[in-house]
Amino acid sequence: MKLINKYANLRYSKMNEYYCEITTELDKLAGLDPNGRWKHYVLCDYEDGCLPIRIPGGTLGSVEYDENKIITKIHVCTDYVVKTYPDDVNEQLQKFIGQKIEIGE
């Protein structure tokens, strides 16, 4: 799974905010406008084995990974900020477990 810098080639690119397949899936599951500015993203610094899942206004969950950058666990809090997730959002995200995380351009 490739992480794409939210602010590629802009002065904010060092903020380490990225879009990926998981954030796109969360946007769809929550019913967010795909062309809107309010979207899910992850923070990535590769230091602690965890990518916080965020949306403007708060941190909603995390993507955990091992030393090989393989996703081992994903969890989203369904009662904080975004209230439009389906009841089985966490189950639907399990399809990403086992994928390798890579930084894209």
Which residues does each predicted region cover?
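Acidic, low-complexity, intrinsically disordered interaction modules
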Residues: 14-15, 26-91
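Generic short N-terminal amphipathic or hydrophobic helices
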Residues: 3, 21, 70, 100-102
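Short, low-complexity, charged amphipathic interaction modules
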Residues: 90-103
